[in-house]
Amino acid sequence: MSDMHEVRQALLTGERAEFQASGKRYIDTIFDDGESPLKHAHDIELKSSSFKWKYPLWYCSDILAKDCTWFEMARAGVWYTNTIRVEDCTFEAPKNFRRCHDVALRNVDFVNAEETLWACSNVSLENVSARGDYLAMNCSDIKAYNLRLVGNYPFDGARNIEITNSRLISKDCFWNCENVTVRDSFISGEYLAWNSRNVTFENCTIESLQGLCYVDN
């Protein structure tokens, strides 16, 4: 991607400021007021940049974001987007990542993870910290390593889940799920994995009131 057009230290405002952008690298750039600044963008790199308003990355593809921040009003930040890599970033806004495919998050902090990662597929989480309810609802094919979660009802309705070396402080975790494997992890919370199928825990510590009810395998 060396032939990318670079945008440095820009302050971008207004609705759809960079609509359908392609082959661009944004460095130290602020996406300020104005909805959907990168709607329908593809082949984009974002470095040390920030989003301050709603819907920044909708219907996008081939996105790389490093050292970026989604501030509190950058709600519903990444929806309907395919092939996105996010590293060393902070999300203050809720409801990020919905109906996305091929999502890789590494060293990411979700300050408010409420309703985040809904209906996404092919998801990789590495060194992710999240605080908020209803994480990863109805996701499929999700792998997490060193996930640190404080929040209730995660992974409701999800399938094909692998979690390793993680810590989940979560009530009603893994409800209505299918094909769940958790290894080398700590889970604390009531009513674990109700109404689920094919659930496996290996070398885990579990603290749960009325856990594993109505489980098939």
What residues fall within each predicted segment?
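Long, distal/terminal scaffolding or interaction modules
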Residues: 1-217
